[in-house]
A protein has these predicted regions:
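Short glycine/serine- and small hydrophobic-enriched flexible loop segments
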Residues: 34, 82-86, 235, 277, ...
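Helix-loop-helix junctions within the multi-pass membrane cores of secondary transporters/permeases
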Residues: 2-4, 10-29, 48-129, 241-329
Length: 388
């Protein structure tokens, strides 16, 4: 019988992944729910249901494939819902969730999404990932301007440990940053209530006009801006997974739990990269343990869904941004190397990287999708017309 161990850096990678995911977008989820008229108690129930759903799916998929598969809510989808759900009843919002997730299940069951992912060159997938993560690296060091002591101390701790004890570099930055923030009074002192909030069932109402005007764009944004980068992240990190099966599982789980506020469950990209990095574990075959740790922290976050927003507001944003940037540094560097390594694919990869990093949104769809589209077209044209 094999012994089981969870190294501290692996555990911390899972913690940082969940921390970054919640800190960067939990407020958007609250705004989307509030736009549909949800009460504070109902919104807290949404956070509970989402945390439990992400925890269960992350644990199940990672244990099944022995691959660091991290699930997440759709942040681009939530941003769309903030405006799309204005004036919509909660029952109609649930109807939109069910409609969109049913389309996701169909897309996975037919294998259409898997076929699209197979034709994306590896260099373009890596370039897209680098473009997605670039802003997190930039945000980390932008904090030096106003929080020099905090960010500088975290960077110094990371550099020292990176040279001497590489696997503990992010852990050291987290601890030193927390100590500096606490000592300088940057951590809010308000009490964070620890209470379990039971999710509330809301019967769906299907309004055809809303399904087309909000549900269909929500489906497209979720697939193009969340699931596609999520699978590209796995591909860029060297992992092979059954795309269709994962889409069906995630979409099916969200479909079942939509009446409780689970508006989407997707394959994570940015936070997953933390669990897929060398800092999580030097052995790529053991990095699934970091995703398992993240799944456990998701469950804890779900059990105390009503406390998440208060906790996030107590942490200094500069600490979270620097922590995310340092945790993703290795992944950004590796992705850039993979993107430009093949000279014949370099131009298309650079275009993919730049468009993705630009943050441009066209037709309500984010830059990650358009980066791959332009990169793919460029790759096809250059491959067909370039002289040998």
């Amino acid at each position: 019988m094999r012994s089981f161990s969870l190294p501290l850096p692996t555990l911390f990678a899972g913690f940082v992944a969940v921390l970054v995911g919640y800190a960067s977008s939990a407020a958007i989820i609250w705004q989307a729910a509030a736009a549909a008229g949800a009460t504070p108690g109902q919104i807290a129930g949404w956070m509970t249901a989402l945390g439990l759903a992400m925890g269960i799916s992350t644990l199940a998929l990672s244990a099944w494939r022995k691959v660091p598969v991290l699930t997440a809510w759709s942040t681009p989808g939530a941003a769309l819902l903030v405006s799309g759900l204005q004036g919509v009843t909660l029952a109609e919002a649930v109807g939109i969730f069910i409609f969109a997730n049913a389309l996701i299940v169909i897309c996975g069951a037919t294998g259409l999404f898997a076929r699209l992912m197979q034709i994306i060159p590896h260099s373009l997938a890596a370039a897209m990932l680098a473009g997605i993560l670039l802003r997190f690296g930039l945000q980390a060091f932008a904090g030096l301007q106003e929080h020099l002591l905090l960010c500088g101390g975290m960077l110094a701790a990371w550099l020292l440990c990176k040279a001497l004890w590489p696997r503990f570099a992010v852990v050291a930055a987290l601890v030193i940053g927390a100590l500096i923030a606490a000592a300088s009074g940057d951590v809010a002192s308000a009490a964070v209530p620890l209470a379990f909030v039971t999710p509330e069932w809301v019967a769906p109402q299907f309004t055809p006009a809303l399904l087309l005007s909000v549900g269909l764009p929500f489906f497209l944004v979720t697939m193009a801006s969340q699931n596609a980068p999520g699978f590209a992240t796995l591909q860029a990190s060297g992992y092979t997974v059954p795309v269709s099966a994962l889409i069906v599982v995630c979409g099916g789980l969200a479909l079942l739990l939509a009446p409780f506020g689970v508006y989407s469950i997707c394959i994570a990209a940015i936070t997953a990269a933390i669990c897929q990095s060398p800092e999580a574990h030097p052995d790529p075959n053991q990095r699934w343990l970091a995703a398992m740790a993240a799944g456990g922290f998701y469950l804890l976050a779900g059990l105390f869904g009503g406390s998440i927003t208060a906790l996030m507001s107590a942490l200094p944003p500069a600490w979270i941004q620097m922590l995310a940037g340092l945790a993703l540094l290795g992944t950004i560097g590796g992705s850039l190397f993979q993107a430009v390594h093949q000279a014949s694919e370099r131009d298309a990869a650079v275009l993919t990287f730049l468009v993705t990093a630009s943050g441009v949104t066209l037709a309500g769809i984010g830059s990650a999708f358009w980066g791959v589209v332009l990169g793919g077209v460029s790759y096809g044209v250059l491959s067909a017309l370039r002289r040998p």
